[in-house]
Structure formats: structure tokens, C-alpha cells
Amino acid sequence: MSAKKSYLKVWRGLAGAAGSCARVFSKKSLARRDRRDQLPFALFLFGLVGAVFQWFLYGNWLSGIVSEYTVAAFFGGFSIVLPILLIGFSIWLFRNPQKTHDNIRVSIGLFMFSSFSAAFLHFSAGFPYPSSGIRILSTAGGIIGWLVGLPLTTLPSYLAKTVCIIFIVLSVSVISKTPISKIVRVIFRYAKWLFNSDSVKTSPNSSVSSSSEHQELTGRDMPDTAGDNRHDETVTVLSGTSLTGSPVSEYHGESSDYALPSLDILNSYPPAKHDDAENEKVITALSGVLRQFSVNARFSGFSRGPTVTQYELELGEGVKVERIIALTKNISYAVASDKVSILSPIPGKSAIGIEIPNKKRELVALGSVLQSIHPDAHPMTVGLGKDSSGGFVLTNLTTMPHLLVAGATGSGKSSFVNSMITSILLRAHPSQVRLVLIDPKRVELAIYSGVPHLITPIVTDPKKASEVLQWVVKEMERRYDDLASFGFRHIDDFNLAVRAKKIASDSRELTPYPYLLVIVDELADLMLVAAKDVEESIVRITQLARASGIHIVLATQRPSVNVVTGLIKANVPSRLAFAVSSLVDSRVILDRPGAEKLVGQGDGLFLPISAGKPIRIQSSWVTENEILRVVEYVKSQAHPDYYVLEVQNQGNIDSHIGDDMPLLLKATELVINSQLGSTSMLQRKLRVGFAKAGRLMDLMESMGIVGPGQGSKAREVLVTPQDLDSTLARISASVSDSKLD
């Protein structure tokens, strides 16, 4: 008995020494009670013995016999690789004994990799049966290769091998916890480098995404039916923003070969390095709280996200969930954080989630999020960021169908809006998606001025914004008139029929309608100026516009009941809350607490239309330099095709122009070319008095050429020099029409 104990002691000592050697370069320290060195030491010895027989004694008759009747009998020719896998897996177990779920995952992945590799070799050797003898089996795929490949024998050999390769790639994804899309991109990249061929490439912004980590939260992608790639060669300025103007049809910019930007235009960042020692310290602190209050529960694992880590707590028998919730303040004290959130239960698990902010936050770059979107995905699909387990969060704006965003200063609301617009510019053609940007702050969205996706210059005047929203309502009604006339229920079906030339109109040429995305950066400013008109237009849009391809995103810093009214909330089903200052604000935006405990800088709670509970995300981040590069690129591809704003009383003013027509045309040319809406400039250049110059400026404002007066400041010019000729022609035509009337 003493000899047996001595052998066990020696075995444990050798296992401990091997484990210490394996952990010598590890950054984290491992307590002695947490070490599990005996199993990995046994695997290490098997791998070492296998390496000696398979590599160093290769060709020896004794080694051949031993190999044929052991590992080669099971795995065939793949047995020469097994020592590497066994030694590598043993080192992993030495260094990560407590990661139970990860260890099971890696074990399953390694077995899949070995089995399907053996099956591939078995098919390559002609798929011999066991009756052929052990010698032939050991040179093919062995017993394992035969068993795994047996269900595939009904397929042709090349298809069976393809299935094996697919499962091998899947096993690599399971082992490395790497999305399949990234593995495919690496394979393509090395294939292109190896063969130096242009035929092995992906599209400029391509990335094949099929990983289970990439969570498509809002349903399937819609087909790409909004817009076409056909353009006219000239820029056409249509008077589509008056409440009686023509409907929005597809883009007519001047570039017929518009190319989407490559995702390489965005910055690339190295992957974040996680320090598991920090998480182990938190688990130790949390376990101490449970022991202190005699709570029968244990931590089964954790999921580290970019901002917070979610620790999974499994309760013992007879322990109420309320006991854990009652310990929230004690947990906050133990981990020195006042931003602790408790999720009970974790969706799909019999466990409670305790979310604690990380000391070192991970940067979620927009480029990495967009890489996870399939290149054939819907053009309105945007990358929101990452969830609390590190998976990418994507959403299709058409399925939301409208979004309400709120957050205090510094919470990351404006960064999210920038990421969303940049996603659209990177993934959508101007013929597919048109934008209406309303920016009462005047500076938040000014960087996007002149992009070809804009349907009108960026609206900064709250009064003008009310008129724009009224125009959107009219545009929605026009689209519904077309849908009703031709018997369609959704704009996608109408566009498909137009492209297939299945429908036609006697009065006009039918063209596909693009999606129309309206973004209001600060709803509170609009509600202060024209609350009744703005609320009425927003409610009409949110109630009816989904089937017409019109969607709206409302952002505000003050989610009070005066800004986010009951009617607006009732018709905007999807919400995104960033950090707010009070529980009341959180209830206004989410109808529940939680947003007041967010840590800011992009930390948010996303509540899509299909979710019962909000999902914690870290919003994607895009720098100003990246936005500038994207904007400059899309502006170099095409010019904007504006629908110039016109007010309702334009006809009354035009009819009284009289002999001032030549002066008006000269004034228009001066203002557009100089991009300076100054009354004193008109006085000097045209040599007219103050009253005449002021009247000319009022006429130009009524025609949508300049914005409203801003005191002593120059007026904003709403028309670019590229649109000068068409604007002058429009003025002349409108005056001629008013005279004929």
C-alpha cells in the first residue's frame, strides 16, 4: 500500500512539475488548489510516446507493428499528426484547468478535426473496408475514418471529400472560437498570395458571415430591391420637396459606374488582449460575498464583452433569485463598482447573470463589425457593435422599422449616429438608399454635406425641418397611391415588378423607389419650435411608412415626456438607450430601469421590436478621419441629386417678381458661386439699395436657395455650384408658369 502511495506521489509530482513548466510563460497565476495537472500530463506522455514512434522510429519494424495495432488502426495516416494535437491540448489544459466550457469545446473540436481528417484520408485511399485487413486500414483513415465516412458513401467521392473539408473548417472554428467568415477570408488571402492571381478575390467590402456569434437580431435580410445601378449622365435637380412636387424615384446622379467603398478605408486595430486574472479576482470577490451571507450558489463561468463581463451564477436547491438581487449593493461594494447589473435569468440558461464593468474597455471598431456582414446582405443592414459576450450585433433598419435613440452628453449617442450613417455610405448605393438628415445643432452632421445619398441639403432650421417632415408624409402617400394602383402591399414587390417590366403607366415612366431614411439628430429642438406639426408628421410616418420603404431614426439627449410623447413612443417599437442621468429617463425610453446604470461612451441597451428584454451592447466606434475618408470617396463617385426645397406660398411671391427677374438671376448666381448668403454683398455687387437686396434674399429663401435669416450672420446657401444651371432654369420656368396662370 505504501508503494502505491509512493507511485501516486511521484506521478503527482511529475505532473505538477510539467504543469509548472507549461505555465512558466503564462501571464496569470494559478492557485495550487485550482490546478488539474494529472490528465494533461497523461495526454502529454501519450503525445510524447506517439511522437517517438511516429517520427523518430519511422520505418522501424517494431514501431510499424505497434503503430498499426494502436493509433494507426483507429486514425490511419492521420496518426502522424496526433502527437502534435495531444501535446498542444495538454498544454492548453495545463494553463486553463478552470475553463470547463472551453475545455469541452476544444475537446469536441479536436475530435471532429481528427475524425473528419481521417475520413478524408479514407476517401482519398479508395475507402477500404475493415475486411481488407489492418495494414490497409492503417494506411488509409483507420477505423474512425471508416465509421465517420460510412454515411457519406452514398455520395460521389468528390462530394464526400467536400463534406469532410467543410466539417474540418467547422472544427477549426469550434477549436479557435473564430468566426467561419474570418477563416474563409484567411484562406482566400493566402490562396491569392500563393497563386498571385486576381481571380481569387472578394468584393471591395466583402466578408462571408455565418458564425453563430454574429447575432442577426431583427430577422432575415430583405432582398436587395430598393434601387438600381443605372444612372443618367447628368445631374438633375428636381423640385420634389414642395408639398405638391413629384415623387422620389431612383437616383439620377452623374456617375454610371458608382463603386462602393472598400472596408479597407476604415482603420484596422489589433485584437484586444484579455486578462483572465482580473476576472478570476472578481469571481473570488463575488464568491466571498456568497459565503459571507450563506448563499448556496456557484459560478459556472463568465462571458467577457468589450465593456462588461457577465458572470454566470447557478443557484443551489431552495435558493430564491430574490436573495441574489437583494445583495446588489454588497456585490457593488465587493467589486468597487456602482454600475453592477443583475440579469435574472440569462435568456436560454438556468443561471443568473451579474454584469460588472471591465477595468480595461475594448474598442469596438466599425470596420471589424462591418466585416461580419455578408456582402449580399440588405443595404440597410448596419453594425451596431458587440454584445456582452463579445458577439457582433447586426440589425436591418427596414425590419425595426423605426428607431428611438436617447442618451445624455458623453453617452455615445452621436457616435452611434455617425456609425449608422457611415455604415449606409459604405454598403448602399445612392439608388438603393436616400437620406434626409435633420441637424438642428448645425455641427453634428455637417461632415456629410454633399454626399450623393442626400435627397436634400442637410436641414438645420427647425421650421424648415417641419416642412421636410410634411414632405416625407406626402412622399409616403404618393408611394402608397402607386402600391394601391398596381395591387402591391410592399415597396419591394413594386420595385421587383418595375425592374421586370411587368407593370407600366400611361402617365409617366415607372422607376424603382429607393429606401428613404430620415435621421433627426436632436428631436428636442424640433419639439421646442413646432411641437404640434413635428409630432403629427412623425406619428403619421411611424404609423404607416414601413411598407412604403420610409424609415425614421429619432435621437435626443432629453428623453422627457415633453419630447418623447406617448404617441411617438407607441409608434416607434425599437429603442436604443445609452447612459441617462436618472431612472425616470430610463423608463421613458425603455419602459424599464437599466439605462441609468450604463457606464457611458457607447455602452447601451438595445431593445429591438422582436426582443422581450434589452440586449446590452457596446456601440461601434468610427473616428472623424475615417468618416472624412468615406465622405470624400463617395463624393468623388457621384454628385448629390437634390430635391430643392420649396415653400407652399412660392407661387404668390413669384407672381410679383416683375422687372426684378434679371436681378434675381444675377443674385442667385452670385450667392451660389460664392456660397455666401449676405445681403450686404448683394448691395455691393449689384449696386442696389438695402430694401431691394433684402427682397432678393427673401425671394431666394422662398425658392430654397438660401436658408432663413440668422441675425447679423450670413444665410446658409442650400444649393451647390454644380447645380447652378439647373437652379437658374427652374427659376425661369417657375416664373413663366406663374405668368401663364
From Swiss-Prot:
**Which parts of this chain are annotated as the region Disordered?**
200-232
Listed binding positions for ATP are 410-415
Please indicate which superkingdom the organism of origin belongs to.
Answer: Bacteria
Keywords associated with the record:
ATP-binding, Cell cycle, Cell division, Cell membrane, Chromosome partition, DNA-binding, Membrane, Nucleotide-binding, Transmembrane, Transmembrane helix
> How is this protein annotated for GO cellular component?
plasma membrane
TM spans (from-to): 39-59, 74-94, 108-128, 136-156, 163-183
Please list the residue ranges that the record places on the Cytoplasmic side of the membrane.
Answer: 184-741
Q: Give me the stretches of Low complexity compositional bias.
A: 200-212
Q: What's any GO biological process attached to this entry?
A: cell division
SUPFAM superfamilies for this protein: P-loop containing nucleoside triphosphate hydrolases (SSF52540), Winged helix' DNA-binding domain (SSF46785)
| Ranges of biased composition (kind: Basic and acidic residues) | 213-232
Which InterPro entries does UniProt cross-reference here? AAA+_ATPase (IPR003593), FtsK/SpoIIIE/SftA (IPR050206), FtsK_alpha (IPR041027), FtsK_dom (IPR002543), Ftsk_gamma (IPR018541), P-loop_NTPase (IPR027417), WH-like_DNA-bd_sf (IPR036388), WH_DNA-bd_sf (IPR036390)
Where found in the cell? Cell membrane
Q: Which residues form the FtsK domain?
A: 390-587
Q: How does it sit in the membrane?
A: Multi-pass membrane protein
The protein's GO terms of the molecular function aspect are: ATP binding; ATP hydrolysis activity; DNA binding
Primary location: membrane
Q: What does this protein do?
A: Essential cell division protein that coordinates cell division and chromosome segregation. The N-terminus is involved in assembly of the cell-division machinery. The C-terminus functions as a DNA motor that moves dsDNA in an ATP-dependent manner towards the dif recombination site, which is located within the replication terminus region. Required for activation of the Xer recombinase, allowing activation of chromosome unlinking by recombination.
Can you quote the domain comment? Consists of an N-terminal domain, which is sufficient for the localization to the septal ring and is required for cell division, followed by a linker domain, and a C-terminal domain, which forms the translocation motor involved in chromosome segregation. The C-terminal domain can be further subdivided into alpha, beta and gamma subdomains. The alpha and beta subdomains form the DNA pump, and the gamma subdomain is a regulatory subdomain.
Q: Subunit composition?
A: Homohexamer. Forms a ring that surrounds DNA.
Q: What family does the Swiss-Prot or TrEMBL record give for this protein?
A: Belongs to the FtsK/SpoIIIE/SftA family.
This one is known as DNA translocase FtsK
From which source organism is this entry? Answer: Tropheryma whipplei (strain Twist)
Q: What is the lineage of its organism?
A: Bacteria, Bacillati, Actinomycetota, Actinomycetes, Micrococcales
